[in-house]
């Protein structure tokens, strides 16, 4: 689907979540009622109202798109699109792939450019198999750096304060991703 020059299918998942949240706000209302479990006793549930305009896409300070693999090579990553997310999480046609296979495939799909001091290689110039081979040859230390890219990438986030009615203890609760807001 293309809308005014924007390919919706290629947008990062966090942009899609933000758009979905705002479309929902315009159609159903600006406030969302959620039930939060109090962190102090992990059992008391408290209803909370959140206003959509308070929910933001948050980017971690530790987040980097450029991952230094060694002194001579840097890997630039791109965010997973909605299509990539769906293919890697809901592909019912390929049940033979393990979680590890799907993780490696997602990482390979999110490669953008590989840089050395002399050259740069655009990942689109290489087949999916070649990109996968590149990812598979990373050391565990290098792969952990790539994992940080995904762990720290932007996401919908909102912190709320709740008071447990039983213990009167105040706690902060962080809600992240659509599941926390609509789950």
Predicted regions and their residues:
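Long C-terminal interaction/binding lobes of large macromolecular proteins
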Residues: 1-183
């Amino acid at each position: 689907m293309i809308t005014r020059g924007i390919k919706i299918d290629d947008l990062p998942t966090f942009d899609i979540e933000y758009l979905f949240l705002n479309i929902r706000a315009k159609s159903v209302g600006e406030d969302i009622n959620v039930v939060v479990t109090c962190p102090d006793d992990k059992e008391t549930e408290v209803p909370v109202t959140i206003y959509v305009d308070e929910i933001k896409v948050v980017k971690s300070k530790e987040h980097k798109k450029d991952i230094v693999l060694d002194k001579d090579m840097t890997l630039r990553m791109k965010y997973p699109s909605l299509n990539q997310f769906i293919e890697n999480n809901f592909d019912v046609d390929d049940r033979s792939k393990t979680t590890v296979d799907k993780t490696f495939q997602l990482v390979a799909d999110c490669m953008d450019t590989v840089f050395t001091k002399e050259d740069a290689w655009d990942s689109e110039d290489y087949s999916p198999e070649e990109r996968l081979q590149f990812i598979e040859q990373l050391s565990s230390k290098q792969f952990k750096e790539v994992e940080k890219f995904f762990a720290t990438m932007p996401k919908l986030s909102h912190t709320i304060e709740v008071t447990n009615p039983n213990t009167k203890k105040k706690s902060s609760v962080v809600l992240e991703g659509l599941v926390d807001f609509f789950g």
